[in-house]
Amino acid sequence: MINPEYLSRIKHVFFFISLCLFALVLHGQKIYYTTENAHSHNDYEQKIPYWMAYDQGFGSIEADIFLRDSELIVAHDEKELEFNRSFRTLYLENIDSCLNKNGGNPYKNTTRNLQLLIDIKTDSIATLAKLIVLLEQFPVLIHNRHISIVITGNRPNPDSFSHYPDFIWFDGVLSRPYTPDQLSRIKMLSDDFKHYSQWLVDGQIPIEDIEKLKSRIAKAHQDGIRVRLWNAPDFNNAWAQLIKLRVDYINTDHIAALAQYLQTNHFEYISPGR
């Protein structure tokens, strides 16, 4: 008869070996750029706001908001305010419906995350205060590890980032230094591509500009923060070069084209962390 204590030890050994093998398999698996790395720039200008990007599985969607008569209106500039597009209706209610449909997840694929980038066009303090009151009406949305609410545009002083609720994150500026406390509330670092480089006629980024960009992006990744470059060229060759630079979110106005590009090309992706 086999000693029970011996059997127990054997089980523990096999369990440990299994864990090691599982870890090795995970370590050997490559992750690739997908539409979770795609950002729908000025999404409200799409033919069907929110849903066009969502249906392609985009990981980040952008809405610009104005505070007008105690309401949050989606618009690019004051001329568009006459369209009276409600931020609540276009984005919060649609995201909430997806969460309810998918058991608390934004997507049916439960590993997928969604970032809502909110570009504040009016006074940062007053608009953020109104936004927080509105967001608190959607508890499933704000208390969700798969959803990130990130503030860009007119932002409060970084020293006050920690004064805001935990469900509010901020978009930092890639070229700007931040303290560790400030970085702890920054979800993404963005910048204007043209601050770093001008696209050459042959469709390439100058080598000296590449090194400058790589250095900035590497520093952000060391801090565990993802990067987005806006105002960059928006076509296949440009996307490929942004990916080579390890930009995490590819900014686009062309949702279907970028989705197809990422689905038919396999570029290895290394996540910086949060």
Question: Where do the model's predicted regions map?
Answer:
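Bacterial Sec-dependent N-terminal signal peptides
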Residues: 1-33
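Phosphate-group recognition and catalysis centered on beta-loop-alpha active-site segments
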Residues: 28-274
